[in-house]
């Protein structure tokens, strides 16, 4: 079916939980922008498309911009979107939906530059609007993030930059602005394999000239300490990032602890530098494999827990078989054993194998499936996929 704002509201209204408490982390969400569009419609009494046309597009002279609120409407000069095939050719890849606000803006590079020029001058809506648009978010921990009001604020080659990318189906776009140089670049492409951000910054390089910092201060050097081979071995093996259930592994090669093949620099007996990021293993774990904390250069923190390899027998896999239903998604899946492997089966009988990533967890068929038990029996399974951290399916059979 063609998705509309009515369908979006229906789906959102069925959600029972959040990925995290507001302010604990940052994760982009389309839903917030969809809800904003609906909110504008309810407050103004106008469609979001009409409100945008009269209050934003026409005042800014964006005469070739409109929302894709009816994907069947013929739009003059609209480019068809494509994506590459494995055979080296292209096939059409169009967005057949009417949901908009999060995306779905039909526009041109010229109109995008008119929009971002107003973010530079504030000619329309004034200085308070500009301040609000560029104010970066702050998490509960006090850490400032790059994301402001639909804008990413940061630096490119030492130059202050405000940018955002976008994509849907086979369309790709990137809009960047360098406020101190009064420079903006917009790139749009109708090929799903295009990288408009790279193209835009290549153009920007031609104009930024001497503003580019070619000798940025080097990251502070860290002095390596010596860690015995036996201690390094304690940190090896597979780990799960608890936030998104991704599986990662540490190994020791040529006397160095490695993460995904990259050698880490020991800066303490339990701390290892990974560029400007740091892994810190629990020093109080005793003889057991320790948990770890991964801190990114911008201060984001990921908890990592050790996980043992899981090589289940057919009898082990049978514990996970059954039907699981999600009222939130209005979907029911079956898990069955097929040819010695667990497989997720949809209502059409299509079976997709999933492989073990740890006890009670399997990867494949669109994400990671984490099974939960009560009283010695599997009762539910959570789907972790991209920005969905815990979509719960209850066992019904």
Where are each of the predicted segments found?
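A short acidic/small-residue loop/turn micro-motif
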Residues: 169, 192-194, 350, 386-387
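Structured C-terminal helix/loop/strand segments within mature extracytoplasmic catalytic/sensor domains
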Residues: 170-213
């Amino acid at each position: 079916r063609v998705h509309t704002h009515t369908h979006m509201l229906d789906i959102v209204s069925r959600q029972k939980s959040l990925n995290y408490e507001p302010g604990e982390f940052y994760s982009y969400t389309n839903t917030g922008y969809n809800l904003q569009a609906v909110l504008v419609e309810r407050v103004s009494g106008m469609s979001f498309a009409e409100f945008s046309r009269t209050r934003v597009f026409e005042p800014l002279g964006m005469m070739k911009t409109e929302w894709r609120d009816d994907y069947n409407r013929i739009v003059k000069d609209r480019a068809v979107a494509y994506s590459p095939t494995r055979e080296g050719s292209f096939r059409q890849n169009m967005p057949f939906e009417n949901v908009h606000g999060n995306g779905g803006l039909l526009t041109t590079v010229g109109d995008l530059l008119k929009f971002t020029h107003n973010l530079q001058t504030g000619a329309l809506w004034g200085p308070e609007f500009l301040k609000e648009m560029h104010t970066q978010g702050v998490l509960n921990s006090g850490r400032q993030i790059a994301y402001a009001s639909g804008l990413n604020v940061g630096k490119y080659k030492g130059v202050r930059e405000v940018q955002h990318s976008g994509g849907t189906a086979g369309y790709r776009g990137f809009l960047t602005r360098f406020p101190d140089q009064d420079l903006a670049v917009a790139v749009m492409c109708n090929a799903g394999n295009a990288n408009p951000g790279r193209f835009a910054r290549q153009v920007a390089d031609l104009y930024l000239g001497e503003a580019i910092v070619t000798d940025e201060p080097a990251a502070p050097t860290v002095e390596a300490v010596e860690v015995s081979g036996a201690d390094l071995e304690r940190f090896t093996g597979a780990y799960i990032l608890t936030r998104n259930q991704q599986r990662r592994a540490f190994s020791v090669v040529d006397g160095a602890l490695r993460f995904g093949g990259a050698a880490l620099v020991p800066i303490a007996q339990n701390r290892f530098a990974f560029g400007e990021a740091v892994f810190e293993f629990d020093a109080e774990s005793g003889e057991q494999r320790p948990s770890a904390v991964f801190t990114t250069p911008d201060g984001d923190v990921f908890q990592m827990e050790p996980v043992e390899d899981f090589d289940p027998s057919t009898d082990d896999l049978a514990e996970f078989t059954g039907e699981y239903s999600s009222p939130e998604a209005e979907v029911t899946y079956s898990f069955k054993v097929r040819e010695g492997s667990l497989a997720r089966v949809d209502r059409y009988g299509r079976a997709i194998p999933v492989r073990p990533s740890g006890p009670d967890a399997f990867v494949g068929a669109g994400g990671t499936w984490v099974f939960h038990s009560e009283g010695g029996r599997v009762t539910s399974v959570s789907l972790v996929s991209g920005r969905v951290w815990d979509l719960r399916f209850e066992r019904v059979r």
